[in-house]
Structure formats: C-alpha cells, structure tokens
From Swiss-Prot:
SUPFAM superfamilies: Ribosomal proteins L15p and L18e. Residues 1-42 are annotated as: Disordered. It comes from Salinispora arenicola (strain CNS-205). This is Large ribosomal subunit protein uL15. Belongs to the universal ribosomal protein uL15 family. The gene is rplO. InterPro entries: Ribosomal_uL15 (IPR030878), Ribosomal_uL15/eL18 (IPR021131), Ribosomal_uL15/eL18_sf (IPR036227), Ribosomal_uL15_bac-type (IPR005749), Ribosomal_uL15_CS (IPR001196). GO terms for cellular component: cytosolic large ribosomal subunit. GO terms for biological process: translation. PANTHER family: 50S RIBOSOMAL PROTEIN L15, LARGE RIBOSOMAL SUBUNIT PROTEIN UL15M. Binds to the 23S rRNA.
Amino acid sequence: MTIKVHHLRPAPGAKTAKTRVGRGEGSKGKTAGRGTKGSKARKNISAAFEGGQMPIHMRLPKMKGFKNKFKVTFQVVNLERLAELFPNGGQVGPAELVDAGAVRKGQPVKVLGTGDLGGVALQVSAHAFSASAKEKITAAGGSTTEL
C-alpha cells in the first residue's frame, strides 16, 4: 500500500487541547489553579512592582526644569573662519555660508569674534553678532547687518 497525504496523522499526544481554566468545579475550575486569596489570586500586579524592592521609577531622580519650545539655537561662525572662506572680502550672508559649507541651511546664523579678519573688509549679514565680532568687522572696514 502506498502512503498518501490523507493517510498521515499526527503522533499520539503531539496535539493536545488548550486547558480551559475556571469552568466548573473540576480540575483547574473555580480558582483556576491560582490558590485562594492574595494578590496572586486576583487580577494582576502593576508592571512597576518589583516585589517590595524600591522600584526604578522611585530610585531615579526627578528631572528638573523644563524644555523651552521657543528656544532659538544658532549656528556659530567665527571671524577666523570667515577670513579663511572669503579672503577677497565682499558680501557674506547665510546663503554664501551654506554654499561654502560653513553652516547648514534652515537654522539662524550667529557670528562670533574668535580670531581676526586680517584686514579683509566684509559686508556680513547674519541673524546675530557678538559685540566683539561687530567691533572687529567694522574696524577692518566692513559692515554688519542683522537679519
């Protein structure tokens, strides 16, 4: 006799029915194998409960302060970098700085006064300037414009 697909059967004991608990008074009935009373016999304990040990959410410190959603984060460019990128002087704005690879587009630019321009006259337009940067740019014969 040849074996065909409809002759195949699972091995005895390989497929057992799921135990349905809490149905009647037989085995796994009434208390459904949970014993009597106590927190384990009732629904469930919270995920934060660690068996009496001080839970992690109480061990860690509370975070102080808040996150200001109106905070403005500037991209910073120093004068020494401007002198490197624009040795011939001329107009310098956020678009030129993006093209030169000094900043990324989409965020405001602030010019800081680290280094010096080496006598290069620049007409710089940016969203913010430090006081020392303004002084050094005007001293070199350039001008500043806040956007």
